[in-house]
């Protein structure tokens, strides 16, 4: 598989992480590079590790995994999205402070946005792709796009203030529904 093809695949796989990064950037009262790097590196790491997992383990259980992977992503994104909407309606501001962004929360988002990368890893095994090169390209692409996503979300959040967390929650739920539809209709 050519490097060009790998970069295109990486860009496509990064779109969920980018959208969630925009959603989280919307909730930031003040832009913070520490938070931005934390989320970008988390998403990049998950996007790089999931193809490795898919390549080495997932290919043995591909029928089993494909039956429920989309439900996991859907549930994680919806739970987090509903919580964000609840926070926006009750005027709680737990997501405004980057230090409140827990490892558990980041892990849930990282898993939810990288389920497709797990499936791609299974495909890479069948195509005999160099998995280390593919994982590196996917991780780097996701990290860069997530950095831009948080920054873009914060920029937009500065302009719409009050509805930012509500919009962020809606984006996460929409991403969950998208994952479910893709796997149920096109899977």
UniProtKB/Swiss-Prot annotation:
A single cellular component GO annotation: plasma membrane
One MF annotation (Gene Ontology) recorded for this entry: manganese ion transmembrane transporter activity
Keyword Manganese attributed: yes
Pfam families reported for this sequence: Mntp
Keywords, alphabetical: Cell inner membrane, Cell membrane, Ion transport, Manganese, Membrane, Transmembrane, Transmembrane helix, Transport
Subcellular location field: Cell inner membrane
InterPro entries per the UniProt record, alphabetical: Mntp/YtaF, Put_MntP
Topology relative to the membrane: Multi-pass membrane protein
Major location category of this protein: membrane
Positions of transmembrane segments: 3-23, 39-59, 65-85, 106-126, 129-149, 166-186
Family the UniProt entry places it in: Belongs to the MntP (TC 9.B.29) family.
Function statement: Probably functions as a manganese efflux pump.
Protein known as: Putative manganese efflux pump MntP
Species: Actinobacillus succinogenes (strain ATCC 55618 / DSM 22257 / CCUG 43843 / 130Z)
């Amino acid at each position: 598989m050519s490097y060009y093809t790998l970069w295109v695949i990486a860009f496509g796989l990064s779109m969920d992480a980018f959208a969630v990064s925009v959603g989280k950037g919307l909730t930031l009262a003040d832009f913070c590079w520490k938070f931005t790097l934390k989320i970008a590196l988390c998403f990049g790491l998950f996007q790089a590790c999931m193809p490795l997992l898919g390549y080495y383990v997932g290919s043995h259980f591909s029928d089993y995994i494909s039956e429920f992977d989309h439900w996991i992503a859907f549930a994680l994104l919806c739970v987090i999205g509903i919580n964000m909407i609840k926070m926006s309606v009750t005027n709680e501001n737990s997501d405004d402070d980057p230090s409140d962004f827990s490892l558990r929360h980041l892990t849930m988002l990282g898993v939810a946005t990288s389920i497709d990368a797990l499936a791609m890893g299974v495909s890479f095994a069948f195509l005999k792709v160099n998995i280390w090169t593919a994982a590196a390209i996917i991780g780097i692409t996701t990290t860069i796009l997530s950095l831009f996503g948080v920054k873009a979300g914060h920029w937009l959040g500065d302009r719409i203030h009050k509805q930012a967390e509500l919009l962020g929650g809606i984006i996460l739920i929409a991403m969950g529904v998208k994952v479910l539809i893709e796997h149920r209709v096109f899977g």
